[in-house]
Design a protein with these regions (language model features):
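Conserved catalytic motifs of ABC-family nucleotide-binding domains
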Residues: 172
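Catalytic Walker B motif of ABC-type/P-loop ATPase nucleotide-binding domains
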Residues: 176-179
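Conserved ABC ATPase "signature" region
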Residues: 81, 128-146
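ABC ATPase nucleotide-binding domains
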Residues: 255-285
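Conserved ABC ATPase signature
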Residues: 151-155, 159
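Helix-to-loop junction immediately C-terminal to a conserved catalytic motif
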Residues: 65
Length: 285
């Protein structure tokens, strides 16, 4: 297992790397989000990006998809340096990606069929007969062909997530990006989504990035895992390698302990001094 951002770069052939995040630095306001962050996503594999809340996991996806630009370092996707691409080129690159967000983001005023058909109608000029075939095929793949005429309000959370997944794959993407796909799901729905992620990756020949803090779920499907903390990759390897790590940060994250390098309390003045100070201030007023 590697436990530094520099060492996290796997020695994979260039044509085997779909996304290469190299020595990236990124700030929001005066806050450093990433400092020399490096991650590689290899073709045909499921790569898990994990870390405590607020470590910038979703921000990394925004950088990869060109929604934000790095301050330093470089991100290449299929060999294209994102920072050098025009808006039109980034748009074209995104056509090769599918994205599944934690809230599903279904359009509430159209039915399931039209939600899945939406990207096809927006980005292609396919005949209606072919759109129908493609939509029903993708809905069948996620087990919801029979729900094509339902409205989003009639769906459970797990069903809505599956509809969103069908929509994400309807354009036959090469790279599928999942941002917190397990949030709010019951155990059965969670198991279904895990199964679909694995089967989609294998059956459709996809490359997948899964951002989540659900350690045990990711361990069942991920080929490669990166743990981000403090703006850097603190550990990388297979899920089994992370589980066997001796790093205090990794152990705390993997076990869910409140005792470790990631503090429970937000930085604050001395407790007693602050209480006494507030009390005296109140009396003076």
């Amino acid at each position: 297992m590697q436990n530094s951002s520099a060492a996290a770069r796997a020695s994979a052939p260039a044509n085997d790397v779909v996304v290469d995040v190299r020595d990236v630095r990124f700030h929001i306001g005066g806050r450093a989000i990433f400092s020399d962050l490096s991650v590689q996503v290899r073709r045909g594999r499921i790569t898990a990006i994990m870390g405590p809340s607020g470590t910038g996991k979703s921000t990394l996806l925004r950088l990869i998809t060109g929604q934000a630009q790095v301050d330093a370092g470089k991100i290449t996707v299929w060999g294209n340096d994102i920072s050098t691409l025009s808006s039109r080129q980034i748009y074209a690159l995104r056509q090769r990606m599918g994205m599944l967000f934690q809230n599903g983001a279904l359009l509430t005023d159209i039915d399931v069929f039209e939600n899945v058909a939406f990207p096809l109608r927006e980005h292609t000029r396919l005949p209606e007969s072919l759109i129908r075939t493609l939509v029903l095929t993708k809905l069948h793949a996620v087990g919801l062909r029979g729900a094509a005429e339902l409205m989003p309000a009639e769906l459970s959370g797990g069903m809505a997530r599956r509809v969103a997944l069908a929509r994400a794959i309807v354009m036959d993407p090469e790279l599928l990006i999942y941002d917190e796909p397990f949030v709010g799901l019951d155990p059965i729905s969670l198991g279904v989504i895990l199964k679909l992620i694995r089967e989609m990756n294998e059956g459709l020949g996809l490359t997948s990035i899964v951002v989540s803090h659900d350690v045990h779920e990711l361990a069942t499907i991920a080929h490669d895992s990166y743990l981000i903390s403090g703006g850097q990759v603190v550990a990388s390897g297979t899920p089994k390698e992370l589980a066997a790590s001796g790093s205090d940060v990794v152990k705390q994250f993997m076990t869910g302990s409140d005792d470790g390098p990631v503090p429970f309390h937000y930085p604050a003045p001395d407790y007693r001094a602050q209480l006494i100070g507030d009390s005296r201030k109140g009396k003076a007023e």
